[in-house]
Design a protein with these regions (language model features):
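N-terminal beta-loop-helix "entrance" segment that forms/cooperates
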Residues: 23-46, 101, 155-160
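Histidine/lysine/aspartate-rich catalytic loop segments that bind and position anionic ligands
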Residues: 136-168
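Short acidic-hydrophobic, aromatic-tinged amphipathic segments that line or gate anion-handling sites
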Residues: 40-44, 102-110, 223-231
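Internal active-site segments that recognize and position negatively charged phosphoryl groups
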Residues: 110-145
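N-terminal basic/disordered segments at the start of proteins
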Residues: 1-28
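Glycine-rich, highly charged phosphate/nucleotide-binding loops
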Residues: 38-58, 164-173
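Glycine/small-residue-rich loop that forms an oxyanion/phosphate-binding "nest" at active or ligand-binding sites
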Residues: 51-112
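Short, polar loop motifs at secondary-structure junctions
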Residues: 25-32, 90-96, 129-133, 147-154, ...
Length: 238
């Protein structure tokens, strides 16, 4: 199982309860990650060829991709590697607009940066993750409140307040944070799930505009299921 998400940890627990042998693989990009039950390996495979070799050498019968919805490279590698074994992709449902939301969806992080560049000066709450900060590095007009799990390792916005934190977050906490920093605009990826959804509720309550980066498409021929139960059914364990 390619993991690193809350859904992957829930699936690991379900497999362990059924005494199904499995290995969870984490990319190792986040410090002190929450670990699933069972055997865990950390680190990459060396592209699709390396993953295919691991699947072959370890006599893997099924692969589950339960990585982050924006881990497009890992998903592409899994699709390329799993030519002889079934691949099940687990993706939590994305977020949907509700009455009162002021969302603007964009296809890429670069499009989000371009949209911010055209916005009135103010404070931008940027929650897209540390790997995407370079897209905003040329913006000298806005101040950024950047929240990431780990410190940035690439270029960052020149006017930035960095907040290191890990969810889940509460509505009251997000409201207090946005008010304290006088946030005018929220930028987020459509990660889905409940751990970080409170920021969207806070933005709605504050009537704040939100730029939402859409998920990358799945590889051709690959479909996804949205629940642990659906994965278990695909594996014949439901």
């Amino acid at each position: 199982m390619l993991g690193g998400t809350a859904e992957a940890r829930a699936l690991a627990a379900a497999l362990a309860e059924r005494d199904v042998p499995f290995v969870s693989s984490l990319a190792g990009r986040v410090s002190n990650p929450a670990l699933p039950v069972g055997e865990v390996r950390v680190g990459g495979f060396g592209g699709p060829e390396g993953l295919a070799a691991y699947v072959r050498d370890e006599h893997v019968t099924h692969v589950v991709d339960a990585t982050h919805p924006f881990a497009a490279t890992i998903t592409a590698n899994a699709a390329a590697a799993c030519t002889d074994v079934p691949l099940v992709v687990l993706r939590r449902p994305g977020w949907t607009e509700r009455p009162g939301d002021r969302w603007r969806r964009v296809p890429t992080i670069e499009a989000a940066a371009a949209r911010v560049a055209g916005a009135a000066p103010g404070t931008v709450f940027l929650t897209t993750g540390r790997r995407d900060l370079a897209a905003f590095a040329d913006d000298h007009e806005h101040h950024y409140l950047v929240r990431t799990v780990d410190p940035p390792t690439s270029a960052t916005p020149p006017r930035m307040t960095l907040l290191l934190a890990r969810g889940p977050y509460s509505l009251d906490g997000e409201l207090a944070l946005m008010r304290a920093h006088d946030v005018h605009l929220l930028v987020t990826k459509d990660s889905g799930g409940s751990l970080t959804a409170a920021k969207l509720d806070a933005a709605r309550e504050l009537e704040m505009p939100v730029i939402v980066v859409d998920r990358p498409p799945l590889p051709e021929g690959v479909t996804a299921v949205e629940s642990v139960e659906a994965v278990l059914s695909q594996l014949g364990l439901g």
